[in-house]
Amino acid sequence: MERTYLMVKPDGVQRGLIGQIISKFEQKGYKIVGLKMMQISREVAERHYGEHAGKPFFNGLVDFITSGPVVAMVIEGKDVVTTAREMMGATNPLKAAPGTIRATFGVDVGRNIIHGSDSLESAQREIGIFFKSEELIDYDRAIDTWIYE
């Protein structure tokens, strides 16, 4: 099974959307294997968004992601990286497909509620930034036989 990294950004936390967002992934059948609320330091934010260093929006992105608490999580399931991205919707909420998290809750590209890894490689890197291996829990769920063949 694949794992991916998701983060409810400060706007999602401040607006009280944590539970609704987590529920969408659980209802889809994905298993949460790591979950924590945290305040991201500037150093961690710069490492996380390192691929954007030097771009005009980099400092604003780092400022925003460190402006309040976030909820970091790792979810597991079949094709979870691709499907989670589809569930989140386009980066710009105004262009996101109806029913996606960003279309439902977002109103501005700079306040788009959630981050999700865009590839397996990114997921592994981001999980390593935000979680120690002992913080990720492997466990069996009774419902898995009803979700996967």
UniProtKB/Swiss-Prot annotation:
Its main location: cytoplasm. It is found in: Cytoplasm. The gene is ndk. SUPFAM superfamilies: Nucleoside diphosphate kinase, NDK. One of its GO terms (biological process) is UTP biosynthetic process. PANTHER family: NUCLEOSIDE DIPHOSPHATE KINASE. Gene3D superfamilies: Nucleoside diphosphate kinase-like domain. Homotetramer. Keywords: ATP-binding, Cytoplasm, Kinase, Magnesium, Metal-binding, Nucleotide metabolism, Nucleotide-binding, Phosphoprotein, Transferase. It comes from Desulforamulus reducens (strain ATCC BAA-1160 / DSM 100696 / MI-1). InterPro entries: NDK-like_dom (IPR034907), NDK-like_dom_sf (IPR036850), Nucleoside_diP_kinase (IPR001564), Nucleoside_diP_kinase_AS (IPR023005). Belongs to the NDK family. One of its GO terms (molecular function) is ATP binding. Major role in the synthesis of nucleoside triphosphates other than ATP. The ATP gamma phosphate is transferred to the NDP beta phosphate via a ping-pong mechanism, using a phosphorylated active-site intermediate. One of its GO terms (cellular component) is cytoplasm. This is Nucleoside diphosphate kinase.
